[in-house]
């Protein structure tokens, strides 16, 4: 990262990182006189400065220069980019509150997960760092440890006991913090299938997320069969709180779902996917042909442009059939191209169009 390069370079040069800038994306054939000319104009707002050095970045095939500010400067007036040879040169600097902002974002993330910075150190069993020391720990170390937790191990990022499940009650009048049954069921199913923890612990975490009638049902099924698995509990929840529509109804509802007027194709596909998954759960549509059925329904039920229709037809004929996410990627790419085209059209000034028309008329005459 550019900020990391700035910090390391400042350490080597023995200068204050808070009073230094990196200018990146400079063409390699741009000499120091040219760089000085550009910076003299662009950095008038910072007062006096000096160019400390230039290095070559092989991966980008560009040059980077380090600039030291000689006066106390309000960093908010420093431009984030300057116009130089070859295009835009980016200006990188570190604001005094940058570390504080990182810690605030990290603490907010951990708070949502029911965790603390000290708890994360204990969970990672980081050697040489006491749980009492995290407030004094650098943001760089915290970022490293958080990434370490995401990369290593099969368990969740944080200790499972701190992972909050969504709330579900099954009540007719749901509280604001509650989730619909399908959303809650998705997370509960993930716990049942993927979390490497004992069945008793899984059932306890599921039970902690329940309120009202849903919690009553959990107590009933456990009383009937104390050794019941989480998966069997969830099957009972599907029977009581899940959709009651028949297999045939779910199939027909899916096949008769079309793109609505004014609805983007990507929004239609997302809406369609919910119905497809429900039909698969009801065994109205075989799971092994879900990708084929999805693609066929999109081609039949959406108002596709010629380019997108041809792309989807090619996928259908030549394969492999796209998954839901792969299909969404193709559709979003096409939508973005269309949006860019229409935006370009809307930017054309009426005078330009009239001028073009007059020029055509003069040619005809």
UniProtKB/Swiss-Prot annotation:
Expressed in the cerebrum, cerebellum and testis. Residues 336-365 are annotated as: Disordered. GO terms for cellular component: nucleolus. Keywords: Acetylation, Nucleus. Residues 344-355 have a biased composition (Basic and acidic residues). It comes from the Eukaryota. The modification N-acetylalanine is found at residue 2. It is found in: Nucleus, Nucleolus. Belongs to the PNMA family. This is Paraneoplastic antigen Ma2 homolog. The gene is Pnma2.
